[in-house]
Amino acid sequence: MKTLLFFLSFLFFAPTGRFFPAFSPPVPVVDVCVYGGTSAGVMAAVAAKRVGKSVILIEPGKHLGGLTAGGLGATDIGNKMAVTGLARDFYRRIGTHYGHLEQWTFEPHVAEMLFKTYLREAGITAQLNSRLRSVQKRGSQISAIVVEQANGTTPQTIRAKQFIDCSYEGDLMAMAGVTFAVGREANSQYAEAWNGVQLLDKHQFPDGVDPYRIPSKPESGLLYGIEKAKLNPNGTGDQTIQAYNYRMCLTDQPANRLPIMRPDGYDSTKYELLLRQIQKKVPNELTWNLMHFVMMPNHKTDINNCGGLSTDMIGANHDYPNASYARRAEIIRDHELYTKGFFYFIGHDPRMPKHLRDEMLRWGYPKDEYVDTDHFSHQLYIREARRMVGEYVMTQANCEGKATVTDGIGMAAYTMDSHNCQRLVVEKDGVAMVRNEGDVQVGGFGPYPISYRALVSKTAECTNLIVPVCLSASHIAYGSIRMEPVFMVLGQTAGVAAAQAINEDKAVQGIDVGRLQRTLRENPLLDGSHPELLVDNDDSLRVTRQGNWQRLTKGSKYGTSVLVSGDGQPASVRFAAAGIKPGRYRIYMYNPTRAGGGGNPDQVDLQSDKAERVQIRVFDGKVDKSLTINQQRQNNDWINLGEHVVMAGKAPYVELATAGSPQPTVADAVLFLPVK
């Protein structure tokens, strides 16, 4: 009977719906072992399988998709055109779920469902609840890894030809003996300006917030969350880590809402700084003051940090990257309790302004999310942990276009972004006050290529390991790269590269990168289908315009900019499909809002007074078709212009004309999507 109970206690439910024994005998040698079931890990596994390799996917937890399925539903990406391949397909499938061509905001359970679907379609069973115990190497090659259950029992050996580390922590990379960095480099190390210590003004306390338990009395001690460390000069390197938090999915729908209850160990003194912050200036509402709300479908949220004291637990994660599993579990639990207490404090502490308490009490945990983790996210936002120091280190110069690479295998498109790393006492005009340090938000540059060499270690260290998440980058460059869509792109790259290394019988550092680039470009879904053609208004080779057009770089544009005409004079823009392959295509035109907006379909901003009648001419190389669209509808969405057959050697195009409308007309991007 004891043997039977022991057996049953170690069964877990695999994503395909089959029961899978966690302590099964060692698996046969597989081609590719992916460690980490993050969004990158799923795409890496699927990519390797689609190009013909046997794959095993190992995930330390019990959920798939990482942060994409853990609450980050407001996709962080500066330029949607940078998202390619399986990553773009993911957001297309999200769109299909919600009745659009593609969508960049979604509910957590929908994301996890889609990741499971990808694995099911590929015939991959993820092995969950299996964390890394050790790595076996022969020379510069990993020969096997040993994983164990979360309680440290039932070790299992897994052998593979190639390994991919898709964990947020870089555990496989570290155990394989690969050089890595933790913390922030000094600016001098890579000739950067935004690395190291940065005392700036974003997510900052107002002047004069007293740091002591008893105001003006240092002997009373510091308030909770303030470190005793001294502020170093700007640009100084250190071992601090940008803050982690939970991206919170809440709902205001009473039928689907569970109240935010007082958490275990609740201590209101942990939020005393919030009261002192509010005493300096009482906010009118929660969003953009105490937190940042972004609405998801079905009355749900993705809530992020915003302000001096918010959901970021600054300073509580500095030992996380190299910590033991037990210590990491403590850190994760501390973040969970802090977050629950933060929301409870706002809604229930009588010292909080009543209008903020009332607003907070509108929100609660959704009944239909995270049903096996008490309706609270299963994934802490590990913004940064270890970073590999590989064959090539991405730096600020890459972000700004001052250094370029020829082996690019994916694009990054976000600002150089770091959340705060420390909360300290500083003096200003002789007065001690609390300050957050480390937040950087520097943009103004376009998409830039990520070097393949940043995904592989130095040759002497390991020749069969690819690291697409904890890749080789400085702290500030990593802050631009570290977005979930980019991780998916790099995961796909890693899967294809691992397969190619097997086929070429080479170290991952020595594969034909040109061949890898061609595969990703010409077969982006890895299924042999024709690649789509996306023509953006900034494509000078394919786009011509007549009349007066203003190029705007703000708003909900699809790429870097959008064209706007509204002077009442005739004007037109032609999007030519030069180089398109023959076949049947469904053609779409993107319809952005002129200002603001987060790119959510149907979202309308204060300047949505666009033209109601815009003339469209579609020429597929043989048939010329005219139609009229209303740009006041389907905001931030793709407008379907119908199906068209493109013949070999023809030159199709889509032309948009203003017809002299005094209302603003926008011209952004045209998509030629193959019909399967």
Q: Locations of the language-model features?
A:
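Bacterial Sec-dependent signal peptides at the C-terminal "C-region" and cleavage site
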Residues: 4-27
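Beta1/beta-strand and adjacent pyrophosphate-binding region of the FAD-binding site
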Residues: 27-38
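N-terminal Rossmann-fold NAD(P) dinucleotide-binding loop
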Residues: 41
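Aromatic pocket-lining residues of Rossmann-like dinucleotide-binding sites
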Residues: 48
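Conserved N-terminal/central alpha/beta ligand/cofactor-binding core
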Residues: 53-54, 59-141, 181, 189-191
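Conserved beta-strand-loop-beta-strand element in the redox core of flavoprotein oxidoreductases
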Residues: 136-157
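Flavin (FAD/FMN)-binding glycine-rich loop and adjacent Rossmann-like elements that form
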Residues: 151-162, 166-530
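Extracytoplasmic
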Residues: 531-676
